[in-house]
Amino acid sequence: ENMLRKFLRVFGIGALVCGGMLSLPCSKSEAAVMTPPFATDTFPSDFDVCLYLHPAYIMQQNEVLVRVKGSDFPGTSTTVRREVNATPGFFGTDTVNTEFVSMHLAGGVVTPGGFFGAPVQFKVGQNNGFRPGLGRSPGQVAENAMTPLNGQLDVFPANSVFDLFIDVWVDINVDDLVQDGEVLRNYDQSLRMANPTLRGFPPPAGDFYELIGWVDPSDPKLGEFGATVNTSRINFYVVNPDGTTSNFLAAQIDPLDADCPHTHTITPEPTSMVLFGGLMVMPILRRFRAGNRTLPV
């Protein structure tokens, strides 16, 4: 803990996750444009993820792998919106665009050692971060079955993906204050989460999303099927107070790490309501912070 406090004094900045990307090209993307009317789904969820903490960030000789677990911040639920009307998508089936409106998860490091118990929180949703400029986290859901198009996404299980930009806050000194050096963001690599067997709207308890890689924010299909999904490590950088990146690499996530889970699971009692006017998540962490193989998704 003393080491972490010392580090905080040295590096007074923060932000990890592609969520901070909106101050960059994220907002330029025309991908996954939402067309009203919309439906809004809310549901409880939890996460389980592993992070590789960069040596320079933790002031150690080697990177450190930590596992982080948690669930919805008390009094909140994950909220996503989706188009009500479907159109033929990448696979030629009824498809709707989706977007994380808000997600606030909280938990801590469960790996034994010097980082054990460190509280961490993360936020998803446009301008909903711990620092200004968090980008939107778009996605799509498409029917798997090649049934006749009817303008409605009503055949399940369906295929769902999201590209997430995230703010991660690690409350190192446990004072409940978001301070410089405690926030990280994935500015240039959106986290691609996938659930190829989504069972309904809202997603029922037991459904889960897995991290499968990342999509470049400049990809014209950001948030859509057909984007180039890279499976190298995902970079998280310290965020400046104004939401810009410090370019200080703090942590990474390895989507191909077979020894660590990278999941977001739906837990009981989701609800759904229709709105007129305009899915899913991932992990949280604590002070932390990558290549290029591709997957056809």
Model regions and ranges:
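Bacterial N-terminal signal peptides that target proteins for export
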Residues: 2-14, 270, 288
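Short, intrinsically disordered, low-complexity terminal segments
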Residues: 12, 28-29
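Hydrophobic helical h-region of N-terminal Sec-dependent signal peptides
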Residues: 12-20, 279
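C-terminal segment of classical bacterial N-terminal signal peptides
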Residues: 18-28
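Extracytosolic secretory-pathway proteins
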Residues: 31-266
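A short, hydrophobic C-terminal helix/tail in secreted or cell-surface proteins
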Residues: 268-286
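C-terminal membrane-anchoring or membrane-association module
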Residues: 283-297
